[in-house]
Amino acid sequence: MKPKSKILIIAGSDSSGGAGIQADIKTVTALGGYAMTAVTAITAQNTTGVKSVVPIPPKEIEKQILFTSKDIKPDAIKIGMLHSPVVINSVIKSLQKIKTKKIILDPVMVAKGGFKLINDTAIKVLKEKLIKKVYLITPNIPEAEVLTKIKIQNFETVYTSSPSFLKLMKDLGANFEIQK
């Protein structure tokens, strides 16, 4: 029997269970993996929107990542909501210590109801420091627009802007990209 892949999920907690760490745990488990977590923020939200976001102190995020990884070495890391520059830098510092190669970034920026989950300074740090450390980035269309400053209006725009988007992602340091 093949051992389960061990996935460390670094993301915000969604109280409704439809996104964030809760959704990632469900996905990893459904695919036969073993999910470990480091919570970056606690949200009060439901299917209609986000009421509040309470950040976890960066040192606590580092402790979660390092202590979990010391016991169970992750085969891959999936990163979701990182809401501030301090948190992004804290996660980068932790990643350098655990040296897992397969890092997937879902650059969560805006909740479905339009609630902004990351500030402009954090977006800059994400682009300048974190993207170059990931194996795969998986932005949705609004996130891709923020990262590239390319407006995607319809399927044709997605198709025609893909080469520019891929070049921009490569320039930022990403190895692979899946647009969702």
Segments (PLM) and residue ranges:
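Alpha-helical segments flanking ligand/cofactor-binding loops in enzyme cores
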Residues: I25-K26, N89, E128, P163
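Active-site glycine-centered loops adjacent to acidic/histidine catalytic or metal-binding residues
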Residues: G12, D106, N140
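Conserved N-terminal subdomain of the carbohydrate kinase-like
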Residues: K2-I9, V28-K112
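Flexible, glycine/proline-enriched loop segments at strand-loop-helix junctions
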Residues: K78-M81, A111-I118, L147-Q153
